[in-house]
Regions:
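N-terminal secretory/targeting leader peptides
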Residues: 1-194
Length: 194
C-alpha cells in the first residue's frame, strides 16, 4: 500500500529510524502515533498523516511459550483464558485508541507536530490495496502449503463485517468489550485443547 502512495518502503528498527529521520535517510515512518512520543520521532518529524493506514503490530492480549502453557494446572489455564479477554480489550482500546490519542495530543502540544489531512483521492489507495493484498496473501499462504487460503480470508473478512456494528456498540468501554470477547470468543476456548 505504501508503494501505491508513492513511498519507498525500507527496513529499519524503531531505534534506527530515529537517526535515519534526523539525517534524512528516511522521509517518513509508518507506525503508531505513540512512537512519535516514546521514540522521540516528534523531535525531528513534524507532520503526521491523519489517515488510518492499518495496524502496525499484533493486537494480541496473551502470548505464551507452549511448554509453559502445558505445565499449567487446569485452574491456571482457566485464569489465563479469563484474563486474556480483559487484557485483549485493554490493549485494543486502552493502548491502540486512548494511548495513541493522548500521545497525539502531547506531541502536537509539546513538539509542534502537525496533523495533516489527506484529500479524498487518498481513499482509493487502501481500497485498491485490498485487492492486491488479497492476492498476495493467497499466494503466500499457498507457498506455506495452505490448501484453500481464499476460504480463510473470506471467513476473516466476514468476521470483520460482523464485528463492525458490535464495535460501535462497545465504543471505548473496556469492560463491555471484555464481556463481548468472553461471550463471543474466550468462552468457546477449551484450555485443555490448546
Amino acid at each position: 500500500m505504501l508503494k501505491m502512495a508513492g513511498m519507498v518502503p525500507v527496513g529499519a528498527t524503531l531505534v534506527e529510524a530515529v537517526g535515519l529521520l534526523q539525517r534524512g535517510g528516511l522521509d517518513c515512518q509508518h507506525g503508531i502515533i505513540d512512537w512519535v512520543r516514546t521514540f522521540g520521532y516528534g523531535d525531528v518529524a513534524k507532520y503526521t498523516l491523519d489517515y488510518p493506514l492499518g495496524l502496525s503490530g499484533p493486537a494480541l492480549g496473551i502470548l505464551m511459550n507452549r511448554d509453559a502453557w502445558k505445565n499449567f494446572t487446569p485452574e491456571q489455564k482457566k485464569v489465563h483464558v479469563k484474563y486474556g479477554a480483559w487484557l485483549s480489550a485493554k490493549m485494543a482500546i486502552g493502548n491502540f485508541i486512548i494511548s495513541n490519542e493522548e500521545a497525539l495530543n502531547t506531541v502536537v502540544k509539546d513538539k509542534g507536530v502537525q496533523l495533516v489531512k489527506v484529500g479524498s483521492a487518498f481513499d482509493a489507495i487502501p481500497e485498491n490495496y485490498k485487492k492486491v493484498q488479497r492476492e498476495t496473501n493467497i499466494a503466500t499462504a499457498k507457498g506455506f502449503g495452505v490448501q484453500d487460503p481464499a476460504v480463510i480470508i473470506d471467513y476473516y473478512e466476514q468476521a470483520v463485517e460482523r464485528w463492525r456494528p458490535v464495535s460501535k456498540q462497545i465504543g471505548r468501554d473496556i469492560d463491555k468489550f471484555t464481556e463481548v470477547l468472553v461471550r463471543e470468543v474466550f468462552s468457546k476456548i477449551d484450555p485443555d485443547k490448546l
